[in-house]
Amino acid sequence: MEPNRRLRYFRSEIPQPVTEHRFPKRVEKLVFSVLSSNALMKLSEVQITTPILYEHYPSPATNGVLDKRLGLSDKVGKCATCGKDTKMCIGHFGTISLALPVFHPGLINDARTMLSIVCPFCSRVKISEADRLKYKVLNHKFSLAIVKEAQEQAKKQVNCPFCHAPSTICKKSQGFRVLREMHYEERATKILADVIKHQKDIEKIQELDQRLRNHVVDPIQALHILQKVPECDYPYLGIPWQSRNVYASQQTPDSIASNDASQLFSRGSSKLLARTASRFIAQHQGISDRATRLTSHAFLTRPQDVILTHIPVPPSCLRPSVQSGSGAGTTEDNLTSHLVRILTINDKLKEAMVSGAVATSKVYAKWDQLNMDVSLLYIGKIPGGVQPVKNKTDSGTKEGTGIIDRLKGKAGRFRSNLSGKRVNFSGRTVISPNPYLSMQQVAIPRLIAQNLTFPEIVTSRNIRFLRELILNGKTYPGANEVLLLNDTIRYNPALKRLGIDVKQSRDMEAKAMELVSRCVDTFNLNSLCADLPELQAAIQHLVSESSNAINSELKAEDLPQNQPLFAKEVYDPAQKGESNNIDNNVCEIDELKLEDTADYQVGESAGQASTVAVEQPPESRTVLKLNSIASLQLTNASSQHLSTFKLNTVSLLQKDRRGRQAIANSLRPNDIVYRHLLPNDTLLFNRQPSLHRMSIMQFNAVIHENRTFSFNPVVCSPFNADFDGDEMNIFYMQGQEARAEAGILMGSHENIISPRHGECMIGLTQDFLTGIYLLSGKGIFMTRQEYCQHVSYGCDGFGDATYGVSLYNYGREFIKSIHDRRGTEEDTVGFVKVPCLSQPCIVYPRQLYSGKQVLSVLMKGNDFDSVNINLEHGDKTYKKDSDRRALSVNDDYIIIQNSEHLVGRLTKTFLASSKNCIFYFLVQNYGPVSAARIMLRFAKVAARFLMNYGFTIGIDDVMPSQRVLGKKEVIVQEGYEKAQEKIRDYESGKLEAIPGSTVQETLEATLNQILSNVRESCAQIALKELHFTNKPLIMSLCGSKGSPINIAQMIIILGQQSFGGSRAPDDFYTRSTPYFYHYSKEPNAKGFILNSFYTGLLPFEFLAHARAGRDGVIDSACKTADTGYLQRRLVKCLEDLSVSYDFTVRNSKKSVVQFRFGHDGFDPIKLEVGTGQCFDLDTLLRHIILLNRSQDLAEGAFPVLLDRYKAEAELDVLLNKDFYGQEACLIERSNVTSYFQQSILPKLTTNTHIATTVAPALAASFLQTTLTKKDIDDFLRQVRRKYIRLNLEPGSPCGAVAAQSVGEPSTQMTLKSFHHAGLASMNITQGVPRLKEIVDGVVKISTPITTVELHVDVDKEELAATVTEKYLEKARMMKNIIECTYLGQISASIIECYSQSVCHIEVNLDMKIIADMGLAGIITVETVVASILHNDKAKKLVGQDQSSGSVSIHSATRFSVRPLTQSRDDLLFDIQSLKLLLPMIPVSGISTCSRAVINEYKEFCQGATSSAPLTKYNLLVEGIGLQNILNVSGIDFTRTLSNNIVEVANTLGIEAAVATISNEIKACMDSHGMAVDMRHIRLLADIMCFRGRVLGFTRFGLTKMKADSVIMLASFEKTGEHLFNAALGNKVDEANGVTESIILGKPMSMGTGSFSLLQAPYFDEKTGKTIEYQPKQTTRFLGEVLNKQYDEEVDAIVNAFWYDEKLYLTGAEAKAKLLRGRRHANKRSWSRGKERHASLKPKNR
């Protein structure tokens, strides 16, 4: 094929983008404004005047709300405005002119504010010139906070600073008017009081009514006032000021009909309304020229726009009419009903104004009814809660049917249709397990695969294969449709009219075909390239070259600038004068006179067959137009016919074999074949709810004959899926770019490690763990036959078990395709042709292989496989202080060297979610593909081994032995005795209360702890006494299911049931159940169950167990909604954050939120160690040493070992090289150095003497740590490589990942607060409620706790006991100082004393209690009296000082208090009030700190001599008042913490608040065992505080975080409020965020959208010129390998028969000719070879 005919490859002399943007025009920003009446009239197509829907059904009434000029709502007919059908016409707006103006329903509060700050006489904002200097910043920077401050100051003005008129304040009034209150408001109030006092004087009532009526501001007056506001006052009204120097000559259209108002005035029936209307008309006619002129920008908000004089009528397609089933009529949309009511009441209002005979009150009532109907149309409700007036004919007025109601909420347009959309090419069905599939594969039912298609573009390399698919048709594998694009272009006579002759000019047609084929979008043919410059240039070039056939040249730049590049109407000479037939703006240069008599139209219509060409009258003309979707369109200019030559999409479902053969023969490159979903195609697999990014991942398809989606159960964890009826979704991507990105970014093997905590999210589960655990046991041996059989289970060489036997039904090419993938980087199956079989572990008396050897073969794979696993770690049951290691009796210490499993049983710790996992090691060192391969092998072998070995659970497995029952009795008896002892102490009063708790609370907490320990002890018995073959014990030990507690509940005892963290409450008439006595504290009466599931439960035990289960079910049901809303708020606030190329975290406005992600910029996925070091240096060094030693032994080399000094010197030399110093920072170098000095070098000192006496190779086997120069070099290289990859990549959406990392585990947290054992019996709010408090930024939290650290001087020589005693003494003292003490706590008595002379209250202090509290000398009578006199509430009763005589001190322990008043009527009431108030008066401590509890904790003390942890004490203070606590002497303020975030921010600053948020979220997660990386939590804290104050993730905080993102705020909550505020403030949305990009359909600026990918040109090395891109010599396409020779032959045939119809051959003929050519070529090559062979024969000597 010639170079200019290769249409697939993009060529250019300069670097070009790899992907050509199909939509070069994008929405860059959105400007919001309130549409004025003038702009609305310009946009309107028709004036709606009649409320009648149909003149003659089904013909809509002219000028009605269903007028056809508004567009179409059904599929029949054409639009009367644009002439298009329903698919192409987007609808047109109309208008309704109101008889009287109304307030805008969404802006009525803003109108009220404007009228309050604008003087009604001079229309100036009531802010003086001097005060305006303070707000001068509004002229160049608009600030809503400054605007509100200025408005508040304007409302306080008594007189207008410009005209000195009295000031007014507008408030709500009845109906839709505004009540203006002036300075005579007090007089009106007095008149009203006089009226009531004189039994409703009629004259005064009328006078009052007249006074109040004169000051009611209706929309007419408001419009008059706001129209005269100068532009310099706009910023104070909340409207940004803009330069308005260019004015139009038009007058303002925002006025009422003056004729109607004049007629109303002449009739004189409504005096008030007439006077108002006439005054408005007179003043309106006298408005200055400046106020009547409009700006050139029609979409700038003005103050008078808050008053409506015209309302828009939406297009008919937005409010379609539904035909009734019987055909008798239609059911109209709610918007249509609202519009009809508005027109009806509008006509009635006009009649009332014209006639003049209607009373004024009725006119006002109709006016209010018009306001109500307009409000229902806009916002679906009536402001102020006013009920609408229902007519007799109305069936009822429904709320929630307005325009705003269609936008807001979950079912609104923003959330239901714009942010999330329903898609095609998707499927959904039930899921089922298949352990023989790779973790990258999902089995798709054949029925689904036949319905899902992919648009495959035909090329010279896949044409043969696609022809075979076309021949199959609907038979799988086949195709459903074919788009013969080339025939549409080649044989279209319209191209001939442009001078493109098929037989004469092939080059020009090739250009046209290349041009249009680039524009066609393969997955949506209705969306073509918009205004491509090269398309316009190509059309100009084609037209200019064919000037003989066309008289004029079309130039895109000659079109008017404001005219769209698309003429929507059909130009008809017979109807040239009608505006409804042609756009008046069509330029004459668009008309191209053609000489031919038959005209055609080339358009686009996907999914329909081509229409025939219709011959037209010779007098018709054709207009060539460029439409907005950049297709080549020839519009027929005849009024009689309108024919279109559409894209030829042919369906194969109804074609027979002959028809499909014809279509296959006509297939050419650039055609599109919609083929079936084939094996190995890329899919997206999803399960809802999608709580994190791993809920939707990329899989490869495998086709099977079943009806479910099948996949490997190891991938269940990220989906949180099980196989009890769950359904999942698939999405079949339709673009090559999307498939490529999904494979790299969303592949399931790429998501083995979760970004939430950096641990494995995908691993072996349940039966797989059980099978591997049993197989790796010490007692598993097998013969060579069994050994090879198990190896073959995992090392599947042919893929039969993986892909299914039914795959052979699809032909050998698919099998060949699968085989060709083996060994490639994308091969996640990991076929093994030649496994690495090892020698038997037992040779005599019989050769036997162990199960560990089978696992070793699975880990090794092929001989050429470079995967070497080196792990050494203890299991969870291995004691950390043990030194037995490989000699552990329980076989729970794992050693794997060079992929040889030597010691230990594999459990969940090494096969699932852990950083000690085998798969985690593989991902970090060898990549995710190797981990996926080995995971599949383990899953296959575990499933087959378990089937052969047998693993069942029966009743005998949970049957306790007599020994176990005996030990149970002993443990239960001991627990009962301890409980009874505590109960007796409680009943006798000997039980002491824990500080901060009552005696009863202390008893319940103690008993709960004692009885819970009983079950724990029984669980330990189960682990020790059960046989090692016990099935529940095996499942518990390997981690597949269950725990020791579950085993104890099945076999031994259920134990204490928990109800919200405590025992069962006595909420059934002072007892838990009717089976027990009232107030019983016995264990069984409080939910302790002595029986097990094996023995069965007693009735009261069954009730307790069911009650505890119900408590958990309710908690789970309630937390679902709370956590779902919590995650939605988190995602909305964090979705815009991403990592920039300077490694800062920025939002969509490019504001810096963090200078480094998580303060260090590291990716949690690549961090191997949680804290301190970034990598597991021990494992890395051991791995390198083992690899080098095995390599040395294989090569026969002798390593030179280093002693300590040589190793240290070598390390210093290597670290100082530039190779390591450029990338590795000083912190990492110091970690490596300290690691060597502490862990490696001491061992070298003690072991290197062996190397002097033994051969080095033998010494290497004995030494515990061997080290060579190569080892150190390789180790540093690996550290450097890992460190370079450690940073989070630029473009990463770190915000969304952080939100999901916190939101997803919150679904597993509890809703209730519980007793925290480590916090000294204080009930701390935890779980979801605490998390909501933190992220919401709540000011008043439920349990504010301040952790007060004490400052104690400790000498180095002091003993631990002395240090502990000092801390305890200091804690008691500080507790008494800080904790608030009330008068009632230290009073012996508070007595009322009545005598003839005086009545008072006598208070006696209990000095013993004061001394016991340690407050002797701090609390005295004088301090108590001073506290009473300084109390705000007591001041009103006893005065402010002692001189008043209300307080008298009688002794050191007694004083009296009496009220100031001596009135008989008030004295008794004041005495009782004072008696209730006195006990609650604080007399010592901090009043806001209700209590302080001493907390004990362990810590290493540097000042003490002992190295053991010391017992220390601190205070937990409940309440607020951090600043007051820090002022107390003796407090260590550097370590004192508070969980009240807002208080910390106000006291210590915003950075302290950031640290507090991070610590609190971390503590909340850790208390529930939820692992979340600290970097995500820090990002949450920074986004809450990066504005300088704490902003919660609420609708209010989000508004302050992203005030300019109108679309995002509207899609979250309060849709109408945000849209109205944005329109009034002329806000500009830059539309750079994620939500805005999704709604507007443009790429977001993160991920792959954060950069542009360029393709460099190819240069000839000799000439230096650019050359065409050449594909690879061999191309794999679903198993069909095409060599270069075949490509050249196909290209030769295509070149010879591509354009010439006479030489066109069918597929069979072309194949025959190809075979003949091959035979001739073989003959020629054979003859040449024979001649050459003859020439090479040796001559005779």
UniProtKB/Swiss-Prot annotation:
Q: Which domain of life is it from?
A: Eukaryota
Biological process per Gene Ontology, one example term: DNA-templated transcription
Checking Gene3D superfamilies in the record gives: 1.10.132.30, 1.10.150.390, 2.40.40.20, 6.10.250.2940, 6.20.50.80, RNA polymerase ii, RNA polymerase II, clamp domain, RNA polymerase Rpb1, domain 3
Where is the region Bridging helix? 1099-1111
InterPro entries, alphabetized: DNA-dir_RpoC_beta_prime, RNA_pol_asu, RNA_pol_N, RNA_pol_Rpb1_1, RNA_pol_Rpb1_3, RNA_pol_Rpb1_3_sf, RNA_pol_Rpb1_4, RNA_pol_Rpb1_5
Region listing for Disordered, in residue ranges: 1719-1741
Q: Which parts of the sequence bind Zn(2+) 1? A: C79, C82, C89, H92
| Organism of origin | Giardia intestinalis
Would you tell me the protein name for this molecule? Answer: DNA-directed RNA polymerase III subunit RPC1
**Residues binding Mg(2+):** D722, D724, D726
This protein's GO cellular component annotations are: DNA-directed RNA polymerase complex; mitochondrion; nucleus; plastid
Q: Assembly state and interactors?
A: Component of the RNA polymerase III (Pol III) complex consisting of 17 subunits.
Task: Name the keywords, alphabetized.
Answer: DNA-directed RNA polymerase, Magnesium, Metal-binding, Nucleotidyltransferase, Nucleus, Transcription, Transferase, Zinc
EC supergroup of this enzyme: transferase
| SMART domains, A to Z | RPOLA_N
What EC number(s) does its UniProt record assign? 2.7.7.6
Would you identify the family this protein belongs to, as annotated? Belongs to the RNA polymerase beta' chain family.
